[in-house]
Amino acid sequence: MGVSDVFAVSGALEVVLEGVAGKGVMAVVYGSTRTSTIPGISIAGPSPEATLYTPTLDIEYLVAGRPLTLDVVPVSPEGVPTPAVITRAVARAFNIPLLPVDAGSWTEARVPHAKLPSRVTGGRIDVEPGLPSGASERLFREAYMLGSSLARGLDWIAVGESIPGGTTVAAAVMEALGYRAADLVSSSGKDNPRELKKRVVAQALSRLRECGARDVLEIVDCVGDPVHVSIAGLAVGAREAGAFVILAGGTQMGAVLAILSRLGMLDPRSTAVATTKWIALDRGSSIRGIVESIAPGLTVAAAGFSLEGSRYRGLRMYEEGYAKEGVGAGGSLVISLLRGAGVREILEAVESEYGRLLGG
């Protein structure tokens, strides 16, 4: 029970166990990229265009218990519910404070949240810059200030994400910064559209010369999105304020690590990745391969939590390879398990929350 239900994909689990002792908070940085509207790239919404609204709906549901902008809970075309169901259930059951951070949503969430002043929706990276010139530097700086302020007096801070299309953009960022990634990132779908992603990444990389990118943040302007660079800034600010940093997400956290590594701001001793077993054991991607190429020795912890025995079909579909991770789900699971929660307790909390959702 608890600690025994978390396993190390790489690195030492003890690092995370010590890191999550004491007080902490989970920030969820969210935003949109038009890359998600490329047909087949993301199933984090009922249609490609609907994926632009998913981060806002995720956050509204996370905070208010239901979406407010549209009267629809984010689901895949197959009806698989957003991973925010897991995050909300676990955070409420095991007292994990949540702070949504808007880095560039398509439409503003109608719940209390932090807003980065330079927030901006990302472009479609195969045909246009990911961000306006200078946006990455501004977002990094603003998120750094937020992380520095937020982490004062805390022992740890976890940072999740919500950005459909994020794994494709993350692959482009990692490749542009010199790391192999295009065939290693995961997908929210059961079948990873690897060839499509590689094609989009190649088109984005072909524009680097056109962008005139000369440094790390200019490269992110060219092929990135608002979320990964904001998480990077927040992580540095929090770490320098004395908090242990948990990157609560899947393979796209590799883009955060790549940005930090190329900026010379990555500290594997005070940073870890926490994710779900659905990412850790995914045969269509390799979070271990990504992290070990960027930050050898950095710990990746995964929650052994399963939904196989759930009475709800929508939740059991996670075991078939759908959704896998997002909105801090893996981080919330790892943190709660390491702090003594049991998998049965968590399953009851998740099923109770999903049942409430279905009941309206």
Curated annotation (Swiss-Prot):
InterPro entries: Nict_dMeBzImd_PRibTrfase (IPR003200), Nict_dMeBzImd_PRibTrfase_arc (IPR002805), Nict_dMeBzImd_PRibTrfase_sf (IPR036087). One of its GO terms (molecular function) is nicotinate-nucleotide-dimethylbenzimidazole phosphoribosyltransferase activity. It comes from the Archaea. PANTHER family: PTHR38811, UPF0284 PROTEIN SLL1500. Belongs to the UPF0284 family. This is UPF0284 protein APE_2029.1. It comes from Aeropyrum pernix (strain ATCC 700893 / DSM 11879 / JCM 9820 / NBRC 100138 / K1).
